[in-house]
Amino acid sequence: MPGVLMMRLQRLRSLNMSEVLYEVIEPGIALITLNRPERLNAWTGRMGVEYFDAIDKAVADAKVRVIVVTGAGKGYCAGADMGTLQGIPTEKSSDGKDDSNILEGRMQDEITRISKPVIAAVNGAAAGLGLVQALMCDMRFAADTAKFTCAFSKRGLIAEYGVSWVLPRLVGQANALDLLMSSRVVMAAEAQQMGMVNRVVPADQLMDVVMAYAADLAMNVSPSSMSVMKRQVYGDYDKDVATASLDALKLMGQSFTRPDFKEGVVSYLQKRQADFPPVDPSA
């Protein structure tokens, strides 16, 4: 599948002028590709609209169980397009309102609240907004050639788009301050050591590894279980352990009433692959 998949993607990229490509691949993987390879997939307003349209499509599709995001060409996402940044007004408009809304819109933190797992396949440079997008995904697999940088401090900016929330949770406060203030470039091996990425693989194997992992989730794991677990991990972070434990008891009771539980037990006893239903909207 992976070799054929890459050929299909290359053909799609050559024929399609969209800034984001979307394809559903068996066994239920939505593949979202940032598609401005000539600009290292630098983020634009149009890309943002198309990206979240693709996310919405994947969430609404009962066949989709896992979402994978990657970049076309050599880069993952080089951050906000410099042409877009140069178009941002540096002064208030005449009516006293801030006119600098060119980069506004739906925010990357939405990814932490959707019901399906999102995996970033970081194939190259991830900088600024591109780094934030990857960090807001639930997991990150990186090519061994991938690079990461916050970049904001070297542009006279601040910790944007919620990176001050997500980065310390992944790498700790001291490392987060180092990366934010210095904007230094971090290679994939160091990023994994810090906890920024889950796994580093040879660049030519990245998509094979990611798609195999995503396929395992899609075929063998309860979508409703993944949805609840995702909500627990993000929601329980600031709770005390006693509250989180009590909440888990309630959620466990609810899980016993879903068909996923029966199917999980029966398929195990029958030594067959489970056939879980799509994610339960109430989960």
Residue ranges with predicted function:
Residues M107-S115, A121, A127-M181, M194, ...:
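CoA-thioester-processing core
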Residues M139, D178, S182-R184, E190, ...:
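Well-ordered beta-strand positions
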Residues V49, G71-R113, A126, K154, ...:
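Glycine- (often His-adjacent) and acidic-residue-rich active-site loop
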Residues M82, E104, S164, Q173-A176, ...:
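A general structural signal for well-ordered alpha-helical segments in protein cores
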